[in-house]
Every structure is written in structure tokens, then in C-alpha cells.
Amino acid sequence: MDLVVVLGLCLSCLLLPSLWKQSHGGGKLPPGPTPFPILGNVLQLDFKDLSKSLTNLSKVYGPVFTVYLGMKPTVVVHGYEAVKEALVDLGHELSGRSRFLVTAKLNKGFGVIFSNGKRWTETRRFSLMTLRNFGMGKRSIEERVQEEAHCLVEELRKTNASPCDPTFILGAAPCNVICSVIFQNRFDYTDQDFLSLMGKFNENFKILNSPWVQFCNCFPILFDYFPGSHRKAVKNIFYVKNYITEQIKEHQKSLDINNPRDFIDCFLIKMEQEKCNQQSEFTIENLLTTVSDVFMAGTETTSTTLRYGLLLLMKHPEVIAKVQEEIERVIGRHRSPCMQDRSRMPYTDATVHEIQRYINLIPNNVPHTTICNLKFRNYLIPKGTDVLTSLSSVLHDDKEFPNPDRFDPGHFLDASGNFRKSDYFMPFSTGKRVCVGEALARMELFLFLTAILQNFTPKPLVNPNNVDENPFSSGIVRVPPLYRVSFIPV
């Protein structure tokens, strides 16, 4: 009898993968590795470098294939043509967000990153318009970034060319830009509220980038019933939302609907305009989560790019020299960089683009979800299926970028030395779900890096050839190793 039970269990295990595929919404999913019962393909994937695992699978199954993260199928799209087709040509059909991601559970469907449907459409449209139009009749966002760039330079000057870890300073600058846009005012770098906020965002960034949280994404039951670092992330989010709630209350007391001071004011005015609409998406809960989203997305990603960028520049002092020569020729020493300078600085512009391309910050994009049954190439993908697009396969395409694993600003220059645009440049994703803060992030990266190199030459503590550029972690986001640098005044 025991032998019969064992054989029955073994047979069930063998049949279960095919039953999964046949029963999932009647669709015809792309091929992929055979999943194990319950676990799916998680044992065949390296969550410390998921991008590499998916690239290896694409060599076997082609540009579109299926992996099972637990019992949930995820369609993986690899290579420029397939990614463009998915995110641009089928942008509407693939505009959903998974409800099973840990971050989606934390946000409860609110905000601008993990919301869906009407709420996402209206919140995204409002956020884009507010960020784009912000500064009309007031200080522009560019002026706020320039002010922060000046403060950043002064903080670096205080190091007196001594070796330092730049992590905090390079995190404080983009965080303060967001504070200026959201709360009207920037903070001093020693302000305790500011330090606490930065600490919570930084800790959550590490937690959400950990293999454990990626594992929780595969098995959502772990999030609800098991201990782990995700519990700390929940506490941190409560802390941040409590702080934002107090800021909102202060804004409500002094709100002038004819003179909005910042993002919160604009949202509160929109709430007032729609107060008679019981179906309005402009609520306090949505404001809280949207502000949290803007902070999380607009601080850590820009900070990490700046840190990784400086590390690469230290490894390539010849690039620093060329950028500084261009800065001297176009800007000089007696004024701050501005965005109008960028069109006259092709090498600097190319360097900023190459930093983003090379570091491949978010290799696999944030997962999309089909909002309807979808025919994609020769496959039928059911509504509610997660789709993972490999941005890494686009940014490191060897046809568009010869020697893609080499850091070379020439990837974005033509034969005459002019800046060359590329459709393959999509570190912010592309299509309907492209990053809301793309324009702000591009501005910050150009102005911050240009201001730093206008005033300093970053020097490593080792020979440039020995600078370690390998990522400290390659989870959802690629994070550079910790390092020390000397900022030598120019």
C-alpha cells in the first residue's frame, strides 16, 4: 500500500506541471523550463543575479518564454524587438501591475507605481502634469536641483580631499530635491527628520532588493504568515506615512488654492475640486502612497546611479579628463551648470547616458500584468499573467552597442563626436509605464555629475585599474560596492 501511495505521489508530481499549463486560463503560454510542483522554477533561477539566469534561458527557449515563480507563470520577454513590441506596441494591454508583489501588498493598490485601472491612469496623469508644470511663476524644478547641486559641492568641499564614503552625501542630494518638490523646502543635511526619513528609505531599499523579498514575491503566503525582513519594511512605511500625514495636516491649515507651493498643495487642491465626486481617486490614502512612491523611486535609484557613476569614472580617469575639458570650454568656473548647457556638451551627455546603460540599474524592469487576454506573437497569454521584460538584454545589445560590457561614452557619439540618440536606451523602461520621474532624474544626473566634475577630480584609493566595479548585489536593483574616494579640488 505504501508503495502505491509513493508511486501515486510521484506520478502527480510529474503530471502537475502540464496540468498547470493546460489549466491556466485556457491560454497557450510560451515554452520554458519544466517547473517543479509548488516551487515552479525557483530552484533553477539565481535570485542573486536573476538577469543572468533569464539570459541563459533565452538562449534555450528564445526571446519569449515562461518561468513559474512558485505556481504563478511569468512570461519573460528578452531582446529589443520583443521588449519594444510588448511595452510599446502592446503598451495598453500590458499596462497592469501584479497584485502579488510585496510592494503592491504594502501599497494596497494606491499610489502611482503599483496601482491599476482608473486610479493608476488618473494618478499618473496628475503626477506627470504637476511635475512638468511645477515652477510656473515660482522657482522651477531646475532651480531647485541647481540649489541642491551647490549644497552638494559645498558638502564635498568639507571633506578637504580626505578619503570618504560618498554614500550619504550622494543620497542626501536627490532626497532633498524630492523634499523640495513635495514639501516646498529642502532640509539641512544634519536635520534629524531628514536623517530619519533617509534611513527608512535606505533600509527599505535594501530589504526590497533582498533575495528573501524576491522569494516572498514567488510565494505571497510568506509575507502574511512568516517572520522576516519584510516586517521591518512595513514598520518603516508606517513611519514614513505618519511623517507625511503630519506634513499634509500642516499644508491643510495654510493651503491657498490660488498659490500652490508644492506637490502636496496641488494634490489637496485637486481633492477639493473633486470633493463632490464619490468615485474620486484623489484621497488622503492615495496622496500618502503617491508621495511615498515619489520618494522611494526618486531617491534611491538616482542616488545609486550617482554612486555607481562616480565609481566608473574613477576607473576611467581619461573620461573624467574629457568631461572636465568640455566643462571648462562650455561652462567655465564662475557659474553653475544648467540644462541649456547639455546640448553643447555631447561628450558629457554621452557619459551620463553610458553610465546608465552600463550599470543596468534595474535589469528586469518592474513586472507588468496583462489587463486582458492577449495574443503575443504565436502565444495566447491570459488576463492577469505577469510579464517580465529584460531591460538588460536591450541595454547590452551587442548590435546596437559594440562591446556592450565595456564602459565607453562612444556608444552615444557619432563619427563626428555629436551626441547619438538610441532607441535601445531605456533604463527608465518605455511605453505607458515609463518612469514618471524620468525627466527629473535625467536633470539631476546631468547637473549633479557636471557640478561635481566642475569642482573636483574624484580619485580612488587604489590604482584605477584595480577599482572594483562589480555590483555588491544584483537583485531587483544592481547596487555598487561600498568604496572610498578623495574629491580633489580642480
Swiss-Prot record:
Q: Which PANTHER family match?
A: CYTOCHROME P450 2C9 (PTHR24300:SF400), CYTOCHROME P450 508A4-RELATED (PTHR24300)
Key word Oxidoreductase present:
yes
Which amino acid positions bind heme, per UniProt? C435
Induction info reads: By phenobarbital.
User: Gene encoding this chain?
Assistant: CYP2C2
Indicate what this protein is called per its UniProt record. Cytochrome P450 2C2
One Pfam family linked to the record: p450
Under catalytic activity, the entry for this protein gives: an organic molecule + reduced [NADPH--hemoprotein reductase] + O2 = an alcohol + oxidized [NADPH--hemoprotein reductase] + H2O + H(+)
Q: What is the lineage of its organism?
A: Eukaryota, Metazoa, Chordata, Craniata, Vertebrata
Which family, according to UniProt?
Belongs to the cytochrome P450 family.
List the InterPro entries hit by this protein, alphabetically.
Answer: Cyt_P450 (IPR001128), Cyt_P450_CS (IPR017972), Cyt_P450_E_grp-I (IPR002401), Cyt_P450_sf (IPR036396), Cytochrome_P450_fam2 (IPR050182)
Q: Does the keyword Membrane apply?
A: yes
Top EC class for this record:
oxidoreductase
Where can this protein be found?
Endoplasmic reticulum membrane; Microsome membrane
This molecule's function is given as: Cytochromes P450 are a group of heme-thiolate monooxygenases. In liver microsomes, this enzyme is involved in an NADPH-dependent electron transport pathway. It oxidizes a variety of structurally unrelated compounds, including steroids, fatty acids, and xenobiotics. In the epoxidation of arachidonic acid it generates only 14,15- and 11,12-cis-epoxyeicosatrienoic acids.
